[in-house]
Amino acid sequence: MADFLDRIKEYLLGSRITALSFVITAFSMILVGRLFVLQIVRGEDYQNHYDLLVEKTENIDATRGSIYDRNGICLASNELAFAVTIEDSGTYQSDSDKNKALSEILYEVISHIQNNGDEIDKDFGIFINSSGEYEFVDSGTSLQRFRADIFGHAKISQLEYNTRLKLNEAKASADDIMEYLTDKRFGIPKKYPKEMRYAIAVIRYNMNKNYYQKYIATTIASNVSNKTVAYIKENQNELTGVDIEEKSVRTYADSEAFSSIIGYTGTISTDEYNELSKDDDTYTLNDTIGKAGIEQYMNKYLRGKKGSQTVYVDSVGNLIETTDHTDPVTGKDVYLSIDASLQKRVYSLLEKEIAGILLQKIVNAKTTAKTAKASDITIPVYDVYYALVGNSVIDIRHFTEPDATELEKQVQAAFDGKKQVVMDTLGSMLTSQEPVIYKDLSEEYQAYSTYIVKKLKDEDVILRDQIDTDDEIQKKWTSEEASVNEYIRYCIEQDWVDITAFTEQSEYVDTDELYNNLAAYIIDRFSNDNGFDKLIYKNAILEDLVRGNQLCAIMFDQGVLEWDEETRNALADGRRGAYDFIRSCISSRSITPGQLALEPCSGSCVMIDTKTGELLACVTYPGYDSNLLSNARDSSYYVSLNTNLSNPLYNNATQQRTAPGSTFKMCSAMAGLSERVITTATQIVDLGEYDKVSNHPKCWIYPSSHGSLNVAEAIQHSCNYFFYEVGFRLAGGGGYNDARGISRLQKYANLLGLDQKTGIEIEENTSSIATEYPVMAAIGQSNNNITTIALARYVTAIASSGTVYKLSLLDHVQNAKGKTVKEYGPKVKTNIGILNAGEWGAIHSGMRSVAEDLSSFNNFSVEVAGKTGTAEVNNHPNHALFVGYAPYGNPRVALATRIAFGYTSHNAADISRHFLGVYFGDEASIEYADSDETRGVTTSGSVTD
């Protein structure tokens, strides 16, 4: 028996196969047992642990605070809306797989969003224009910052030649960048339409900005419909990472009237993020911040404080559990000093006055003769027709689109014929052996030549910084004595040209070959240039190849005007004349001065409470619609604002500076009285022509005379001669000294705050006081340049006999419980105590007499004191100004009004009467402000300055 067992043992141990089989069997039994435990005994527990695979912490955006006027009228608020978002929560084997998966998901989502009538967010530095071409939104430094962001550089200076992409990053075109994004970076299938590839690229780029910040969702579309919400919710399991979020959409009331004050919000830029995150690490590159105006200045109060929560999601993104929830804190509310009703009505009245001036000056002519007298300048109606094209009221690029109307196609055909002639002529000019010098060209071809050379410089084909301004040929070009050929050829010879822009050859190329290449480049480059096309249109209109009635009819076709089939067809077939029609459009303001960008097209008014220094109105015209810039910025609208020749993004109330004209004479009177070069009783005889200085300036009344006047009468009649003498005397004292006179004028301008910013919280330019010619400076000319808001503070100081305020647009900030957490408001900067009551009285009396002489203030219920002013501009209509206050005996409000190129100060005075009327509750002024009526302007009173 023992031997038997020993043999069995020897057999088992000696067989390797048997031993291995034994081991495998043992392990198999263990594995089966373990699987039984995992799947049967503890399967439910492990499944739960699998589902709770991802833990992430999310930020919860705070609701932005609202902005109110002084009376609690809401100007900026929030509406709850649904947004489609995407978070890259997928797992991929490679970048190629990732690009393919995301492209498919985004294609699906974008298609459904658009089919539901919703818009994709496209706040991006490139947009697709109406011709279907890629175009940059910004220019200059902003464009370079965008390029740096695209190519992953922290600084603009890091832009370089990219050997991998074979392009100069600093000069990458919109097409270059979109090719890089769609093809090389994100691998978006070429089978998709251009608009779809663009939309996917924009979303992918925005997603990529947050690659280092986990669990930050990117918005695909804001403020979507319930239909889109339902689609996303129903298909969420297939649309990995796509979700619906509740977001606040910023909305603005009466935005055009308030845009310059309130500004708008937008997505934080790289530079803004880098700056703001230094002090607050809760910022992300998806955040919305104030981008301009009070929204920007008060962002830290309006923004609120983000909340947070920890969420657990399963492998497909389904929410399993939420923990550690912290509610966001709503932003604080900001209250302004501005009276919303007054602001809105002043804006309306200002637009009406400018429209009225246009109606007075438009004449039924192609051109008008040049005149030496600014008030005689008229506007030929053909300039109005061209303005429809030149300022992009009509989109000429739509004429070549498949859905262009027959009338648009007719106009395009006429234009094409004209353009062919122009390009052929330019080609001959550039290759001529006997080129014509610039001054001998027709005005038409001078304009083309100027445009081409300027554009070549703007695009760094001709290198501005290389040009020697003292070079003889450069001087010949500047003085119009050189031909375009000679100038461009010389630029090549002097290495003032970047030849890589038009040739791939860089060595062993002679000047003739380079010139021929550049000439060919010019013809090719300007055959597809919207600005150059507009110049051609200008001449096509003058030659009646394109007619005014056609352009007016096309405004109906393109939706610029509300559809009226009968009127549209009457214009199209010539049964209705364009001249009367366009005048009716201006009168009804269905076409506004801001759209036409003729002279005048802009203006401003600032009104201040003289007793407190509070800003009541700060109006600039034209404004813009903040709603189209906030939230998901409409890039095409932003571009239209930047290219609009009336400059709606520019605040004329706080930034525009012109000579103050005769409104400065109260400052000169103060200087003269305080320095004792005159007294209130001093009589100066107006001799018409002032011969004590070499330029022999004349009084505006010359060859007549005002006779003998004191300072109050000189203000009343705006006598230039009187104030020439004051300026001369200020420069006296031991012999005439120009610097002494300027120094004394500057001293009192400084006391009145005319050479400083006023303290408001939005962008403001600093006014400047004359640095030469005290005789001319004393009447507000020389190189005086003062903003409207500085003039308003100045006249407030005069009305209050010397109180100069530091201004503020703000009143207070309060939290959600209504508790005031910070007070704002004006502060007394200076009390000027240099004049006695009699001297102030003389200035006030003169201003009262000005208003009494103006028919604008006839039968006005409140006594007004004021001063008109005219700032002269060579070869243009004069700027029109008026400053004043009321009531005369006990001032409550002061104002300054400026209409750039407004012809005569009477126009500024006329509309200022209505501004004051609205403030004092005058029913006629309020009714006019609220009506659709536009009245023609009238000559008012006898003052001319």
Model-assigned labels for residue ranges:
Residues 34, 72, 106-108, 232, ...:
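Active-site SXXK
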Residues 2-586, 595-604, 610, 727, ...:
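Membrane-proximal periplasmic segments of bacterial cell-envelope enzymes
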Residues 54-56, 86-99, 214-222, 282-285, ...:
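Second-shell loop/turn segments in exported
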